[in-house]
Every structure is written in C-alpha cells, then in structure tokens.
A protein has these predicted regions:
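Ribonuclease/tRNase effector modules and their secretory precursors
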Residues: 1-81
Length: 81
C-alpha cells in the first residue's frame, strides 16, 4: 500500500466537514468508485450509512497519486453521486 499523506488544506476541510482520517483511509483502501480527473489526480468515493442520522451519504476524496504516495487534497460529503 502506498503511503497516505494529507495536505494542510485537506486536514482543515476534513475537520470543518466532520470527516475523519480513518474514513478517508478506508475509502482510499476500498473505494466504491474511482475516476481519474486528470493525470495524477483521482477522485475516490464510497457510500456511507450515517447511523446517527439514519441516512446514506457519499464521501468523496480528491487525491494526487504518485508512484510512492497518495496525497489527499480534500474530502467532502454529498447526498448523491
């Protein structure tokens, strides 16, 4: 597995949006869907069930992928794909 690193921007946005590093790592390791949006940049997403809200959401993770690492650029929640 490649090393996963988080940019300062990603960490700030994840805190603001209530997304944990654990959730992001889980999505990177087992994404429901992955799309390359430009060379080296991918968006990975997975459907998550929020037990407290009893709702289904998607978490999207944007990352720059290199030979040795995955650098998380940002992550956010959305209600649809």
């Amino acid at each position: 597995m490649k090393k996963i690193v988080f940019t300062d921007h990603a960490l700030i946005q994840m805190i603001r949006r209530g997304i944990s590093k654990k959730e992001v790592r889980r999505i990177i390791q087992n994404p429901g869907q992955t799309d390359q949006i430009r060379p080296g940049r991918v968006v990975m997403q997975s459907r998550i069930i929020e037990r407290d809200r009893k709702s289904e959401i998607w978490i999207r993770v944007f990352a720059d992928v290199s030979e040795n690492s995955i650098e998380v650029v940002t992550a956010y929640r959305t209600s649809s794909t």
